[in-house]
Amino acid sequence: MNSDNDLQIAGDILEVPHLLQPPREHPVTVAEFAGLARAIAADRAQWEHLVRYDATTRWYHRLRTGPGYEVWLLSWVPGQGSGSHDHGRSSGVLTVLEGTLTEHTGRATRALSAGAQRVFAPGYVHEVVNDALEPAVSLHVYYPGLTEMPMHTAQSCEARPVTA
C-alpha cells in the first residue's frame, strides 16, 4: 500500500506563493493583452467621456501606450468601415465596447456585439464595418505599436471556393 498522500506528492499549497512571479506592470503575452482590453472595457470611466462621433470619417483616439504596445479607442457611425486591411507586423486585440460591428475575413463574416473580442496575428486580413443602425465603439490593442496598416482589395476578405 502506498502511504503517499496528496500533500506529500504536491507539496504544501501554502508554500507556493513564493514561487509565483509578481504581477507585471505592463502586458507581454497575448492573454495579458486580451486581459488589458477586458479591464479597460469594464472601466467605462476610462473611455466613455472621450468618445466622439464623426459622420465624415472614423474617429479615433490613442488611449494609452506602454512598452511595445498601444491602445486605441474608435467610434463607428452606421455605414462606416475600415476597408480590407492588415496591421503589418503588429498583433492585436479588438474589443467591441458599444453597439455591433461586422468583421469580414476570407473565411467568415462575424457579428461582434458589445463584449465580443477578436485576437489576431500579424498579416491577418479583415474588414470591420458598422452595418447596424446605431453607432458603435471599439477598443484596439496593438503589440508592437501600430506602424502600418496596408490596405487590400475587397476580394481578399471574400470567401472563395476551395480548389484542388
Language-model segments: residues:
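N-terminal leader/capping segments at the start of a protein or of a new domain
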Residues: M1-R44
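A short glycine-rich, His/Asp/Glu-containing loop-to-beta-strand
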Residues: H49-Q80
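Conserved short histidine dyad/triad with adjacent acidic residue
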Residues: W72-H87, A121-G123
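Glycine- and acidic-residue-biased ligand/ion/polar-headgroup-sensing regions
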Residues: P78, R89-H104
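A short hydrophobic beta-strand segment most commonly corresponding to one strand
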Residues: V93, L133-M149
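Short acidic-glycine-tyrosine-enriched beta hairpin
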Residues: V93, T105-V125
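Asparagine-centered strand-capping/turn motif at beta-strand->loop junctions
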Residues: V128-A132
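Extended, aromatic/histidine-rich regions of cofactor-dependent oxidoreductases associated
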Residues: P144-A164
